[in-house]
């Protein structure tokens, strides 16, 4: 049985730790800081860190890799197209690997960075997606390297995953993302309900993750670029007629950058 824990890091990062109760092994995703992981291992001395999964090269996702590799000799898996510290296995689109007995498939999702990947575990009841900084709860990552078209295509690819997919993104941005979503779709009842719920959770110091794909399709404006109300708001903000969904996305992303 696998349990998934969020290890907070920095101001708003989450390092995801997968704990295999049967083998007493564990894996982590995007350890930007080694300390939270080493602290967990110290509190759970029977467990051994076997794998480190990396979605992209930004330091808040890889800053702890070298120290963890030195301390644990864990296998480091990351995107082939980016420079990843201590990487053992370079991954490209559609690669498959087994971690803690779970098979994951790699999805290339350029946009936030050009080599960004996501890890997807297909399961009949509970599919898992570790999306890094591509798909957030109610939002998406900034475009540091890629184009709006690339990010729109990447999000569209992820949106085709099953509605039941649990989404483990790397930051606690949900509240600010939902405030933006409400500005885009003020009449969207699902967004209003989710905003109220997440506001309550955060006031209780609870995390807002994981999300799920069905919820994202109802409340994430960056997955709703085909909705008439979203296009109209994007047109209004950009003072132009956005003639494609990727153009709507570009308008929304530019607005969010200044929101």
From Swiss-Prot:
Instruction: Give the protein's cofactors.
Output: Zn(2+)
Recorded GO molecular functions are: hydroxyacylglutathione hydrolase activity; metal ion binding
Record field: compositional bias (Basic and acidic residues): 229-239
- Residues that hold Zn(2+) 1 according to the record: 56, 58, 112, 133
Does this UniProt record's set of keywords contain Nucleus?
no
InterPro entries on file: Clx_II_MBL, Glyoxalase_II_hydrolase, HAGH_C, Hydroxyacylglutathione_Hdrlase, Metallo-B-lactamas, RibonucZ/Hydroxyglut_hydro
- Key words, A-Z: Hydrolase, Metal-binding, Zinc
Which amino acid positions bind Zn(2+) 2, per UniProt?
Answer: 60-61, 133, 171
Instruction: Supply the Pfam families for this chain.
Output: HAGH_C, Lactamase_B
* Reaction it catalyzes: an S-(2-hydroxyacyl)glutathione + H2O = a 2-hydroxy carboxylate + glutathione + H(+)
Q: How is the cofactor bound?
A: Binds 2 Zn(2+) ions per subunit.
**What processes in GO biological process is this protein linked to?**
methylglyoxal catabolic process to D-lactate via S-lactoyl-glutathione
Q: In which pathway does it act?
A: Secondary metabolite metabolism; methylglyoxal degradation; (R)-lactate from methylglyoxal: step 2/2
Disordered: annotated span: 220-243
- Top EC class per UniProt? hydrolase
Question: What EC number(s) does its UniProt record assign?
Answer: 3.1.2.6
Function statement: Thiolesterase that catalyzes the hydrolysis of S-D-lactoyl-glutathione to form glutathione and D-lactic acid.
What family does this belong to?
Belongs to the metallo-beta-lactamase superfamily. Glyoxalase II family.
Read off the PANTHER family from this record. HYDROXYACYLGLUTATHIONE HYDROLASE, HYDROXYACYLGLUTATHIONE HYDROLASE GLOB
Q: What is its quaternary makeup?
A: Monomer.
Protein name per Swiss-Prot or TrEMBL: Hydroxyacylglutathione hydrolase
Q: What is the lineage of its organism?
A: Bacteria, Pseudomonadati, Pseudomonadota, Gammaproteobacteria, Pseudomonadales
Gene symbol here is gloB
